[in-house]
Amino acid sequence: MKICVHGAGAWGTALAVNAAGRHEVTLWARDAAQAEAIAKARENVRYLPGLALPPALTVRAGDLHQARAGAELVVVATPMAALRQQLMALRGTTAPVAWLCKGVEPALDASSPASYGLLAHEIWGQVAPELMAGVLSGPSFAQEVAEGRPTALVAASPHAAVRDALVEAFHGPALRVYANDDIVGVEVGGAVKNVLAIATGLCDGLALGLNARAALITRGLAEMTRFGLALGARAETFMGLSGLGDLVLTATGDLSRNRKVGLLLAQGHTLAQAVASLGHVAEGVYCARTVVQRARGLGVEMPIAEGVVALLDGRLSPQEAVASLTGRDPVPESVRP
């Protein structure tokens, strides 16, 4: 199978490495100097230092149309902010297309309260609905995938051809790929878990204990499910890899950038300091406001996400954000909106 991966960050490189032993894979970097450095060193020093790239993996820059010529699967491994441009550039492509990003697009008009960012499948529907497209998501740190550690992901698309292509491309000895046609649920899980991970990082940074962490994860899953149901997702999707699975990993894993933001805020760092120290994107910081804004518009209650936004905006201190949750009136345990 011939695969072209757009984007030589950690995740794009990790999947390219994973598939290169079984398929003909081209890893395309936007920056020519980066591509040359990776190809020469056979290592992505910036994103996956110490990991040798397999000899069969081709790394290139330059003409993207030429790089993906004849590809049977195109994988877009760019941040959410670049997805719209990438999908527009892929108009006319007949091969299946899949993106890897999780979160929401930055609002097109940040000054307008009525403007909010879109999930990836909504961008797809706006700019290139003719593409056969979908998402590869689930609980995964790029470093572990690149090292060949056991991982399970979900390929989500309304098109069976896209799901089948992703399974064929990446399912192997260490990486299991499950198929799901609920792209809305898979993407909601991938976006909301980043917001909730900031909350669990805050919990851990304040040393509130494992009971508190478990409560946040469980009630956070309820918020995620309510939000997803209101957008048309299926409830069972949130008990799968892209829901519960990704939430547990991102909320507890030491490699989680979103959890790290919460930890740093709990230690007294400003948001700007926390983000600057990461060196990479923490999508939860950028999608939290959109999640809350859309939830309000749908009449969905998301108190944990609301607390995270108040914390990020500086309206609540870490301690006040916790108090805003623990001081709530008792309610029945419920997942439904």
From Swiss-Prot:
GO cellular component, one term: cytosol
The EC number(s) this enzyme carries: 1.1.1.94
Originating species: Variovorax paradoxus (strain S110)
Binding residue positions for sn-glycerol 3-phosphate: 102, 138, 140, 193, 246, 256-258
Pathway: Membrane lipid metabolism; glycerophospholipid metabolism
Pfam families per the UniProt record, alphabetical: NAD_Gly3P_dh_C, NAD_Gly3P_dh_N
Primary role: Catalyzes the reduction of the glycolytic intermediate dihydroxyacetone phosphate (DHAP) to sn-glycerol 3-phosphate (G3P), the key precursor for phospholipid synthesis.
Molecular function in Gene Ontology: glycerol-3-phosphate dehydrogenase [NAD(P)+] activity; NAD binding
Gene from which the chain derives: gpsA
Subcellular location(s) per record: Cytoplasm
First-level EC class: oxidoreductase
Gene Ontology biological process terms from the UniProt entry: carbohydrate metabolic process; glycerol-3-phosphate biosynthetic process; glycerol-3-phosphate catabolic process; glycerophospholipid metabolic process; phospholipid biosynthetic process
Major subcellular site: cytoplasm
Alphabetically ordered keywords of this record: Cytoplasm, Lipid biosynthesis, Lipid metabolism, NAD, NADP, Nucleotide-binding, Oxidoreductase, Phospholipid biosynthesis, Phospholipid metabolism
Family statement: Belongs to the NAD-dependent glycerol-3-phosphate dehydrogenase family.
Catalysed transformations (reactions): sn-glycerol 3-phosphate + NAD(+) = dihydroxyacetone phosphate + NADH + H(+); sn-glycerol 3-phosphate + NADP(+) = dihydroxyacetone phosphate + NADPH + H(+)
Catalytic site: 193
Binding site for NADPH: 11, 30, 102, 142, 257, 281, 283
Listed name of the protein: Glycerol-3-phosphate dehydrogenase [NAD(P)+]
